[in-house]
UniProtKB/Swiss-Prot annotation:
SUPFAM superfamilies: Prim-pol domain. HAMAP family: DNA_primase_sml_arc. One of its GO terms (biological process) is DNA replication, synthesis of primer. Heterodimer of a small subunit (PriS) and a large subunit (PriL). Its EC number is 2.7.7.-. Pfam families: DNA_primase_S. This is DNA primase small subunit PriS. It comes from Cenarchaeum symbiosum (strain A). The gene is priS. InterPro entries: DNA_primase_S (IPR002755), DNA_primase_ssu_euk/arc (IPR014052), DNA_primase_ssu_PriS (IPR023639). One of its GO terms (cellular component) is primosome complex.
Amino acid sequence: MHEKDLLLLAESFKRYYFEHFERIPVPDRAAQREFGYQRFGGGMVRHMRVKGSDELRLLLMQNSPSDVYCSNGIYSFPELPMSDKDWKEADLIFDIDAKDLGLPCRKDHTFRRCSSCGRSHSGDGCPRCGPGAHDQISVLCKDCIGGAKKEVEKLMHILEEDLGVGRDSVVVYFSGNEGFHVHIGGTQFQGLGSRERGELADYVRFVGAVPQAFGMGRNGAARRDFDYDDEGGWKGRLHREFFGPKSRSSVAITAAIKEGHRAFGERLKQISPVLGANIDPHVTTDIHRIFRLPGSLNGKSGLAKIPCINLDKFDPGSDACLIDSDEVQVTADMPMRLKLGGRRFGPYNGEAVSVPRFAAAYMVCKGLASAA
């Protein structure tokens, strides 16, 4: 990224933090959490202690970071190296990202940028430079966000029905790019280690299910072994998915018994991504991870990580677009349309345009424009 692009982003982000610091709540037990930040065009700074609002404001004003992070972990000494922090517990957080869903619309809003000349293209090779190194870029998509919302709802239903997690103890945040962070409140899960969190991640993803747990023995099964249609949890969900309503399940159960153990196991594997919540298990199991600070801007987009009060109506292109709207001159190379802040932009073919600062920041973050 060119120096003028870094300056544009640093100015835009700093202005946001100066004018809207009230949007960034200081986490509970902040002094026991590790903070960190990413510099524009620079490296990561970690192992910081922030005691309160004044120190957080100072960090943002002095450094104008591209990204700000805070640990889910609680430590005795958060400012020390990891081996000396003395971990106590950690918040339980799930990550759902639209790019991991494999939706068919993905190809329609993803393209490539040549690493040599910086031009955007949708083919296998750059029209100017030919085949070579490239970056893959995607922009906001209503269908992708909708798909991620469905996974959030699926996760929340599993947590509520199977584990007794009330909706009032769950906060869903838009990540600032293309996904959601689901924060689970309370103390029920905070003491879990990585192994236990891994088991929980497998559970909500419906990974590792075996036929015997659902009535299908290695040596066959009887009809009574599938009499769990009224049960809660995975048994009830699986029964409804495999066999349908009780009034019409007889034929499906007979067919499953005839097909046997191996076929039933294959069906379990196939149905796993349909019934389970598509979360990133590595995020859930990492008890030392630092997460994007709520209210802060995402350096990959210029959009904010904000809570979704009404998930169904939430529109990231509008609700999370919080940078100022004064006009900025950029040279844009964006081969598709983009809706942001209630306005439409593009397509652009290497042309000079005047756009609101929030759009300029988004396009520069994505590598779709350069400051004029």
